[in-house]
């Protein structure tokens, strides 16, 4: 069985957030984490793998190379492989299109996503991805 877990990289909620003079989010001194809902999805996938060793877990992130440490963390937690679509995640629609194209090119038996990311709290990516894949 092949499981795909889609993860987002979000600021740790304990980080002090600030903005630049141009009103842009200042990433300096911000710790980024795997979103807690995506972390939960990964934990459930690993639990399934512990019960059935033939399960293969893949991680997917739409983002830039700065997210690579979190993909490596996901591998350390128990994922077998990690993929990153190298693109700035502009909005939920853009991310959903990228995820759905990746899923169409690969054959997964189960797709797990968090209910929402804690940075924008939109909760749209999984719905949009499902609609694009006619699920």
What feature does the model see in each segment?
Residues 1-135:
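N-terminal glycine-rich FAD/FM-binding segment characteristic of electron-transfer flavoproteins
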